[in-house]
Amino acid sequence: MDMLNTLRDTLSSVQAELSTGVEKLRMNVSANIVAQQKVSTESVNEILNTSAGNELLQNFQNLITEVEENGAEGGRLANLCSTRMGRCQQMCKEKADAVMEIDEFLRNSVEFDKKIREINAQISKLTRFCNQTEQAMTYLEALCEVAHTEGEVDLIRQQAKSAATIVQIECESPSVLTSALRSRPEDAVKAQQEEVMLEEFLSSKNMQLP
């Protein structure tokens, strides 16, 4: 409020001084242009030499400087806004193109349905392949288990054969000893018979001698 009052007083003083200066100019008007310019210059200088005129001129200069600064800042912001608007326009164009492509794709329902059917067929093939792979893996696991079981059975058979061989040897050993024992008395009887036959032969020879 004080600033407005001060400005009003300043304008009033300037107006009064301008009126005085104009009256002086009217009184000193001459036909010579140079004289008029001289009078005008003197009047302006006289006005500027006053405190109110000097203050008003300073205010005008400050306002002009502020207007220039605001103009430069406005130009900078305008350039920045233009750059951002260009980017926004490019982004909107890309989004619009994408939306148009989606719209065109959705409008072509036949092609869309065809692609869905192709995808379903590929999924069915993949599912069948996975099932076949699972069955093959199960079959391979069963084969591995059978091979492992057969290996264990062969090992058991070999162990059984070895045990049977050992048992057979143990069973045959007493019969061999028994046969050996049985053959010994027969050999003794045979030897005794041979001795008797030899003695009879010798005795017969002795009896035939003169």
From Swiss-Prot:
Cellular-component GO terms for this entry: BLOC complex; BLOC-1 complex
Any GO BP annotation? endosomal transport
Residue ranges the record marks as coiled coil: none
**Quaternary context:** Component of the biogenesis of lysosome-related organelles complex-1 (BLOC-1) composed at least of blos-1, blos-2, blos-4, dsbn-1, glo-2, mutd-1 and snpn-1. Interacts with snpn-1.
As for what it does, the entry says: Component of the biogenesis of lysosome-related organelles complex-1 (BLOC-1) involved in gut granule biogenesis.
Provide the family line: Belongs to the dysbindin family.
Name of this chain's protein? Dysbindin protein homolog
